[in-house]
Amino acid sequence: MHPLAALPDPLDLDSAAAAVRPLRGATFAVAGTPAAQATAAELVALLGGHVVAVADGARPLYHAAAALAANDLVALLQVAEQAAIAAGLTPAQARAGLGHLMQTALDAIRRLPDDAPLRLGLTGAVARGDAATVARHLQALNQHHPPTALLHCLLSAELVELMRDSALGPAALAALDTVLAQVPRPGE
């Protein structure tokens, strides 16, 4: 059983209830013999969770997707905090403010219907097609920490792809593509 849930170090938990809480409603990939899978499915049902089938050959990709969604989110907060602190926020202000921003962004995405495009949960310069603001952000990040500028560029390029079927229009998308193409990549 592999849950799509962030589980803290069990040594830090105060009770069994706290240990189970993140598992309630989670999606679980199950593997093993048919009997083991049936038992796992019963446990998942008791937790109000959902069972998904993941082929053995696809398991590394499944785990990578989980790492992108959870662990890389921590890395993203780390680099965002560093930029906010460099901009003048205290570490506590950066953590509280950016943590709140991330939570409200996740909440907005989770409120979307399952079949809705993720772009409907997007806010900010890319969603508006504001290439000039994206360019200013990239320039500031490049002065602060070039690897963070590259990270922002690569993630923004994914956001532009999300916006391709939106009402932005070809001129705004082309302007965003042009700005993002100007960020130096390793080896260039």
Where are these regions (language model features)?
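Rossmann-fold dinucleotide-binding core
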Residues: 1-63
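Generic hydrophobic, helix-prone segments enriched in Leu/Val/Ile
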Residues: 23, 62, 102, 152, ...
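Short, well-structured alpha-helical segments
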Residues: 41, 95-99, 153, 177
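Short polybasic/polar patches that bind polyanions
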Residues: 45, 85, 164
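Helical "substrate-binding/catalytic lid" subdomain
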Residues: 57-148
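C-terminal active-site/capping subdomain that shapes the small-molecule cofactor and substrate pocket
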Residues: 116-188
